Amino acid sequence: MNKQSHYSIKSNFLSKSEKKISIDHYDEADGPSLSSSSSVISKNDLSREKIINRIKNLIDNKFSYNKNIKICTIIKNKCMIIQTIKDMLFSTNLYFIIKIKKSFGLFNSVYVKFFDKDIFENSALNLYNNAYELAKKNSTDIVLEKNILLKNELIAECKTRNYNMALDMYSHKFVYDTYCRKVFVVDDNVVLKKYKIYAHIVD
């Protein structure tokens, strides 16, 4: 690894006006042009076009950071809904996580939480520096996060994508994978499987 660049700050940060990548052409290959709407999609009116429209308006308008923004309630077509949201948001340079959780009612809902670019990148850099020094000292992997529950794989995927984008000045490729953790419970060891986000150290 290039030791001179290890603690360098990313110099090509995007300006505020460049904070997001336009997705106006997304519909040319993936769906029809959509009208403007910023409201949460009704669970009885779910379609791929409605989801695309919701995400486009969310990105094109001012949104709050660090708040769970509801996209829609899932009744059916869960894979289609999640894949559509991922396809659109993963093509931007925004930092976010997508989560599925049950609020009030019987059905799960999809939420998106966005993070401020400068704050997230500085936080990721500090986290990386500490994790790198620990990995180098102990000859282990560079672990940015662990203890992510298996049911939260979508969150692990989003976080991994965020870290790779924020730390792309380094030679590491971060991935998420399961690992086993032993927990002592009532006179016995219980093995728990969870996700961690890590990269192999490269000198």
Swiss-Prot record:
UniProt superkingdom: Viruses
Pfam families per the UniProt record, alphabetical: DUF5864
Listed name of the protein: Uncharacterized protein L333
Assigned protein family: Belongs to the mimivirus L332/L333/L334 family.
InterPro entries per record: DUF5864
Organism: Acanthamoeba polyphaga mimivirus
